[in-house]
Swiss-Prot record:
One Gene Ontology molecular-function label: phospholipid binding
UniProt domain TIR: residue ranges: 74-226
GO terms for cellular component: cell projection; early endosome; endoplasmic reticulum; endosome; Golgi apparatus; interleukin-1 receptor complex; late endosome; phagocytic cup
Variant or mutagenesis effect after changing K17E: Results in exclusive localization to early endosomes and no effect on ability to promote LPS-induced IL6 and CCL5 production
Compositional bias annotation for Basic and acidic residues: 1-39
Protein's name according to its UniProt entry: TIR domain-containing adapter molecule 2
Cellular location(s): Cytoplasm; Golgi apparatus; Cell membrane; Early endosome
Main location group: cytoplasm
Function: Functions as a sorting adapter in different signaling pathways to facilitate downstream signaling leading to type I interferon induction. In TLR4 signaling, physically bridges TLR4 and TICAM1 and functionally transmits signal to TICAM1 in early endosomes after endocytosis of TLR4. In TLR2 signaling, physically bridges TLR2 and MYD88 and is required for the TLR2-dependent movement of MYD88 to endosomes following ligand engagement. Involved in IL-18 signaling and is proposed to function as a sorting adapter for MYD88 in IL-18 signaling during adaptive immune response.
Subunit structure comment from the entry: Homodimer. Interacts with TLR4, TICAM1, IRF3 and IRF7 in response to LPS. Interacts with IL1R1, IL1RAP, IRAK2, IRAK3 and TRAF6. Interacts with protein kinase-inactive mutants of IRAK1 and IRAK4. Isoform 1 interacts with isoform 2; the interaction occurs in late endosomes and disrupts the interaction between isoform 1 and TICAM1. Interacts with MYD88; the interaction decreases after IL-18 stimulation in a time-dependent manner. Interacts with IL18R1 and IL18RAP. Interacts with TLR2. Interacts with RAB11FIP2.
């Protein structure tokens, strides 16, 4: 699944307000019941939408929803997984990669849609992007959720051939996690060092357009198959 273009999805709920009906104190009880029934019928019709007896209107609405959903989903270049206290640092790295190196679009995990399960957001973030960047800071080891994130990302890169070498540990300039304290599973992967003199060269070698296009193609094919199975 892809990830939405906007950083934070705004999903206002349209709550239909029921017009208050003033009951006539001197009226009969039957009139009051009739008024309530009429009000309830109007509320149900307004909430569900009045549909014509034929199915002519249903099909255009279904067709119109497809392109809109496709526009909202986009395969990303990268996602940055980070500790909760490192959101600002993650945003700085995102800005660095997008504006200084032209690697876009990218997203940080804190920008994933609200109101959804963390696991669903994690799955969408990892599978909806070409590279998964693990922001290795001092806060990384203190956050249990970060440990789960990097183990899940590594398992995903191993189990799916096209995601091989897609997990990129990165030590940023601010409060980087020392190598000796880095989890053993991540020590086996060559990390992206922002303070290194070869940082720019590393970035160019990692984020290659050919790799992105290949993963994007597989992502589109997977989505197409899933949509066909859902319709069937």
């Amino acid at each position: 699944m892809g990830v939405g273009k906007s950083k934070l999805d705004k999903c206002p709920l349209s709550w239909h307000k029921k017009d208050s009906v003033d009951a006539d104190q001197d009226g009969h009880e039957s009139d009051s019941k009739n008024s309530e029934e009429a009000c309830l019928r109007g509320f149900v019709e307004q909430s569900s939408g009045s549909e014509p007896p034929t199915g002519e209107q249903d099909q255009p609405e279904a067709k119109g929803a497809g392109p809109e959903e496709q526009d909202e989903e986009e395969f990303l270049k990268f996602v940055i997984l980070h500790a909760e206290d490192d959101t600002d640092e993650a945003l700085r790295v995102q800005d660095l990669l997008q504006n200084d190196f032209g690697i876009r679009p990218g997203i940080v995990f804190a920008e994933m849609p609200c109101g959804r399960l963390h696991l669903q957001n994690l799955d969408d973030a990892v599978n909806g992007s070409a590279w998964t960047i693990l922001l290795l800071t001092e806060n990384f080891l203190r956050d249990t959720w970060c440990n789960f994130q990097f183990y899940t990302s590594l398992m995903n890169s191993v189990s799916r051939q096209h995601k091989y070498n897609s997990v990129i540990p990165m030590r940023p300039l601010n409060s980087p996690l020392p190598r000796e304290r880095t989890p053993l599973a991540l020590q086996t992967i060559n990390a992206l060092e922002e303070e290194s003199q070869g940082f720019s060269t590393q970035v160019e070698r990692i984020f290659r357009e050919s790799v992105f296009e290949r993963q994007q193609s597989i992502w589109k094919e997977t989505r197409s198959v899933s949509q066909k199975q859902f319709i069937a």
